[in-house]
Structure formats: C-alpha cells, structure tokens
UniProtKB/Swiss-Prot annotation:
This is Photosystem II D2 protein. The modification Phosphothreonine is found at residue 2. Its main location: plastid. GO terms for cellular component: chloroplast thylakoid membrane; photosystem II. Belongs to the reaction center PufL/M/PsbA/D family. The D1/D2 heterodimer binds P680, chlorophylls that are the primary electron donor of PSII, and subsequent electron acceptors. It shares a non-heme iron and each subunit binds pheophytin, quinone, additional chlorophylls, carotenoids and lipids. There is also a Cl(-1) ion associated with D1 and D2, which is required for oxygen evolution. The PSII complex binds additional chlorophylls, carotenoids and specific lipids. InterPro entries: D1/D2, Photo_II_D1/D2_sf, Photo_RC_L/M, Photo_RC_L/M_CS, PSII_PsbD/D2. Keywords: Acetylation, Chlorophyll, Chloroplast, Chromophore, Electron transport, Iron, Magnesium, Membrane, Metal-binding, Oxidoreductase, Phosphoprotein, Photosynthesis, Photosystem II, Plastid, Thylakoid, Transmembrane, Transmembrane helix, Transport. Changing residue 343 to S: In Alba-4; loss of activity. The chain crosses the membrane at residues 41-61, 125-141, 153-166, 208-228, 279-295.
Length: 353
C-alpha cells in the first residue's frame, strides 16, 4: 500500500475508500467486499447445521429422530425441513409461528430455512469472492463462472423445487441419509433417472471425472525429466518460466490411441470446464422443471401392452411399477397427516408376480 505525505482531501478521506482499502488489502485470508456476504452467511449456515444435527429433533416435523442427542450418527443426523402445514413460511425467529421462542423455532424446523437461505447466500458470496480476486489480479472470471454450476444445483434443489411444491417440507433435509431419501423420492414421484436433464447431468459429472483422470495421468506421463527432488512437487521451481510437460508428446500419444487428440491447451482446458459446468446447469434446469411437475419420458405404449399381455415386460415397465411402489410407501410414511391408506389391490404388482 502506498502512503502519500500531505493532507487528505475530502475525496481521499471518503468512507468508501477507507473501507475499500481495509477490505481489499493483502493479508493471509483475503476479505474483500464479497467477504461481507460470504463470511457471516457461511458461519451461520455451518453453525446452524452443527447445532441442528447435534441437538434438534425432527419429531414435530417428520416424526423422526435426527440428532446426535437422540442417538443418530453422522450419516443419519440431519437438519430437517419444516412440516408440510407451514407451507413456504420463512419461519423467522420473531415471526408469528415461533414468536421469539428459540426452542419452539427449532421444533418447527426454523433451522432448515436458516441454513438453506444463509447457505445459498454464502455460496453466492464465494462466487463473488472469486470474481473480486480475479479482477484484483487481472485474471479472467472463469472460476466464478464455473462455480455457478454448483450454485444453480443448490438453489434449484433446495429452494426452487420446494417453492414449486406445497412447501419447504418437500425439499431435502440437510443430512446424508436424508439426501438419499430425497433421491428415492425424486425417482418415485418424478421418474428422475429417465429425465433427459438428469441424463445430461450424469454425462457431465462422470464425463468430467473421466477427463480429469485422463488429463492428470497424461500430464504425469509426459513430465520432462527433472531435478533430484523425491517427487514431482519438489522437483520443479513453482516460478519457473518453462513448461513442465510435453504437449506434443501427449498429442501424439492420444492421436495414436483414438485417432484424434487436443492440439491446443486452451481448447482442452475449456472443454474440461465446459463438460461438468454444463452438466450441472442442465441438472438444475431439470429440477426447475420438476418444481413445475413436468414429466420425464413416458413410453405409454409399453405400459399399455404390459398391462394387457402378462408375458410382456420391459425394464421400463418394471421401473414404472417400482416407482409406484415407492410412491405408495413414501406417501403414507412421509405424509401421515394426510391419513393415506392404500388397499392391497391398488399396490403395484409386476407381471412376474
């Protein structure tokens, strides 16, 4: 930071400039303007999650035990969504539901909205942090653009989907087993695995894993012979100007393997950015569609034929029956307030039974 001698003018002593200088100065942990959003929101979201999983029951919202205090472990504890009867209430601590009573607020599921909203703004703050730092050191903003993928998925699953349904109740609770249950719910009620947006998301994420593995292995395979260091990380000076691996050798190797190969580093790395981020965006779009109850692929002709012909069955018709079973079980289990009772004759049976 440059210090100029002399009197400050009004412009130089402006409060914004003082704040800007303090927030953006070089320190071990960069704060920045984005930090005003990121750090408080991340602190409250993580703190709320630890508080909920440690102490707070889901008995009043789901009829479940969900905390360490009740005997759950890391995989089964969760911060559960509010009850279906509370619809889309923000469940503010000082609102009409809890009326300032912290214990009642926790019992009603107030920690879920607290964690979800602070978590969403915390993620947005982290993306803005990447924008801010990139601008400060004159980098392109592709890191921030890439991080918009996870943000889109989080916002679509935890906020937009339940907003399209009857309440926060149908969002995922914040816990490992709770997320698994939500995945089963998505399959049973939306046939999510047959949704083309889910297919694009899977292709993006798994394709990105494949690209990452291939890229890392190829770079390791084509490293130039280096110094005496015991491993790759010590052998090179991190500030050296020369390349550490041979793009030409890598190109020739993959040209022989596949017949085609990336010949340009920018295109190769853009492709590695494009595949996973596009997959995440497509998944988020698909979840927005589910919020509106848009359907996945339906092969009705196969369903009709399977219903008429006891000897005809496909993997698709078997999965449809499985979805019906999930719905019949989950609806009664998850929504006891609806008093849903399914007689035996309406429960799904495969032709093989």
């Amino acid at each position: 930071m440059t210090i100029a001698l002399g009197k400050f003018t009004k412009d130089e002593n402006d409060l914004f400039d003082i704040m800007d200088d303090w927030l953006r100065r070089d320190r071990f942990v960069f704060v920045g303007w984005s930090g005003l959003l990121l750090f408080p929101c991340a602190y409250f979201a993580v703190g709320g999650w630890f508080t909920g999983t440690t102490f707070v029951t889901s008995w009043y919202t789901h009829g479940l035990a969900s905390s360490y205090l009740e005997g759950c472990n890391f995989l089964t504890a969760a911060v559960s969504t509010p009850a279906n009867s509370l619809a889309h209430s923000l469940l503010l601590l000082w609102g009409p539901e809890a009326q300032g009573d912290f214990t009642r607020w926790c019992q009603l599921g107030g920690l879920w909205t607290f964690v979800a909203l602070h978590g969403a703004f915390g993620l947005i703050g982290f993306m803005l942090r990447q924008f801010e730092l990139a601008r400060s050191v004159q980098l392109r903003p592709y890191n921030a653009i890439a991080f918009s993928g996870p943000i889109a998925v989080f916002v679509s699953v935890f906020l937009i989907y339940p907003l399209g349904q009857s309440g926060w109740f149908f969002a995922p609770s914040f816990g490992v087993a709770a997320i698994f249950r939500f995945i089963l719910f998505f399959q049973g009620f939306h046939n999510w695995t047959l949704n083309p947006f889910h297919m694009m998301g899977v292709a993006g994420v798994l394709g990105a894993a494949l690209l990452c593995a291939i890229h890392g292995a190829t770079v390791e395979n084509t490293l130039f012979e280096d110094g005496d260091g015991a491993n790759t990380f010590r052998a090179f000076n991190p500030t050296q100007a020369e390349e550490t691996y041979s793009m030409v050798t890598a190109n020739r190797f993959w040209s022989q393997i596949f017949g085609v190969a990336f010949s340009n580093k920018r295109w190769l790395h853009f492709f590695m950015l494009f595949v996973p981020v596009t997959g995440l965006w497509m998944s988020a779009l698909g979840v927005v569609g589910l919020a509106l109850n848009l359907r996945a692929y339906d092969f009705v002709s196969q369903e009709i034929r399977a219903a008429e012909d006891p000897e005809f069955e496909t993997f698709y018709t078997k999965n449809i029956l499985l979805n019906e079973g999930i719905r019949a079980w989950m609806a009664a289990q998850d929504q006891p307030h609806e008093n849903l009772i399914f007689p035996e004759e309406v429960l799904p049976r495969g032709n093989a039974l």
